[in-house]
Amino acid sequence: YNIGNLQCPNAVLQHMSIPQFLGEGKPVVFVRKSESDYGDVVRVMTVVYIKFFVKTTKLCVDQTVWKVNDEQLVVTGGKVGNENDIFKIMKTDLVTPGGSKYVYKLLHCPSHLGCKNIGGNFKNGYPRLVTVDDDKDFIPFVFIKA
């Protein structure tokens, strides 16, 4: 989403499952760090880089990988292979209203620091993804194969 009329939009927003609000979520690809992880399945706590799977301009083609900026906001502009742009997926004990037990949380896990949950915060009126210090504070994610 383009906040601030940037040449390459870099905001990563939380998709709200409310009709008419921010449209549909955008598909992502999980790029595994290790070549030993084969197949289509990304296992929990595997080191991954998260990359939007969207059409983009030639100018912005390198602006699709997620990272955390100095304000602790999740933005694009990361690089696959950069140890600071590592994320992990962790299973939670939550259950969806429909009864699914496949509810996860995302962690940002730069190599030189411990992992932090990805939570939410409204910044300038937008539901932004941010790192949070409280282990119980996180946004639950449900993944749908695109």
Swiss-Prot record:
Its main location: other. Keywords: Disulfide bond, Protease inhibitor, Thiol protease inhibitor, Vacuole. It is found in: Vacuole. GO terms for cellular component: vacuole. The keyword Nucleus does not apply. GO terms for molecular function: cysteine-type endopeptidase inhibitor activity. The keyword Oxidoreductase does not apply. Disulfide bonds join C8-C60, C109-C115. Inhibitor of cysteine proteases. May protect the plant by inhibiting proteases of invading organisms. Belongs to the protease inhibitor I3 (leguminous Kunitz-type inhibitor) family. This is Cysteine protease inhibitor 3.
